[in-house]
Amino acid sequence: MEKAQIRISVRGLVEFILRSGDIDNRHVQSPENAMLEGGRIHRMIQNSMGSYYHAEVSLRYQMETERYALSIEGRADGIEDRFFGMSSMEVPPGEISGEKRSAKNGSGRKKTKATSLSERLDTWTVAKTTTQMTTQSFIEQPVLVDEIKGTYRDLKKIKEPMLLHEAQAKCYAYIYALQNGLDNIRIRVTYCNLDTEEKKLFEKDFFFEELEDWFLEVLAQYRKWADYTCEWNEKRTESIRQLAFPYPYREGQKELVTYVYQTIYHQRKLFIEAPTGVGKTLSTVFPSVKAVGEHKADKIFYLTAKTITRTVAEETFALLRGRGLLFKTVTLTAKEKICFCEEVECNPEACPYARGHFDRINDAMYDFITHEDSFDRERVEHYARKHQVCPFEMCLDMSLFADAVICDYNYAFDPHVYLRRFFADASGQNYLFLIDEAHNLVDRGREMYSA
């Protein structure tokens, strides 16, 4: 039997496993503007580099277990390597035991290594320009992996890279070193002010063994989440296989179920118009769930314009769970409605749930997903209070482990608030959208995109 595939991006991995500290939105800029400017800054910096600099390099690491294959993938902002492309870009499967894999010289380049750890550069070097060499800690200049970050912060106040930015660069550096048989490699975190275009660069050298120890430790922390995902997906798929339509079909209902399933199977679009009370919600949710069980879709997004229709969707999934379905659903509630505080001030000084949120959230989530299948507002509030975390942020995070997300149109279509964790890049996931009362999208769309 073919192994299950579990995929996560490099950024998703480090942001999930290594996050810590407080929620603090006091210094956050408008995300849509920052994203547009960030893309421009990336291209500007990448285009200014020399011929040995290669932008947007796709990298992939795969670890095989007895039950599933775990893939960590992403694109390095830049790699500076004069031997680029001379060795295979495919990572050999690793063993789940975590045994170190010896790097093999794949390009004929000279392999060199400092004689002791005291010879390496133990602190960050702040490079003045993109072409300046840092203090030599190895016999020859190593390959460099560049992580570019746009920011509105005063660069003079940045004394060292943020942990998560450094971690992304280290992941890409490890995968690239493993693929290309490198004993050492350099990472660089490049900060560029989005207003002034001023740059500040931090560089650091690593032995391959150092990166491997660090990377395998990160994977070890993610292991329980991957194990859980695999086990849950197996149980979910088996329950879907045995699931039958809960009632005798009404007139025309079986045909509707068939149309919906065929639409999903052939990856088409279907517009449905039918009177109230004919069972449209059940007739669309049931075949959608079946499609997930047959791997025709990875996740269902049930999009609505009204709270009452979100309740109908929750009741429909609850009905199917009552018939034996194992299927996790999350209902996203607006921050203003679910916040525990009188005023929505998301910073550690104003909100005790924001203070230390990221130190506690992963334990809270694991407690939640291993004890509940419905992540509705009432249950979210219960677990958020139990673990003293922000209920709104917890709700968003639980969507990562939900089989269906019930939410307002905004979370899919509004450029200001859409779920970037799912829709910001081409993740390769196959999402299924059930849009209730789609005629409302016209007016809502005008509101979302109005200047």
What are these regions (language model features)?
Residues 232-273:
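Conserved pre-motif I regulatory segment
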Residues 266-287:
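Walker A/P-loop
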Residues 168-171, 214, 287, 312-320, ...:
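Alpha-helical scaffold elements adjacent to nucleotide-binding pockets in ATP/GTP-utilizing enzyme cores
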Residues 262, 281-296, 316-319:
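Walker A/P-loop NTP-binding motif
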Residues 68-212:
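Mg2+/Mn2+-dependent nuclease catalytic core
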Residues 284, 387-404, 409-451:
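Signature of the SF2 helicase/ATPase Hel1-core->accessory helical subdomain module
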Residues 1-88, 117, 135-139, 167:
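Metal-dependent nuclease catalytic cores that hydrolyze phosphodiester bonds in DNA/RNA
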Residues 115, 237, 243-244, 296-405, ...:
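A substrate-engagement module of RecA-like helicase motors
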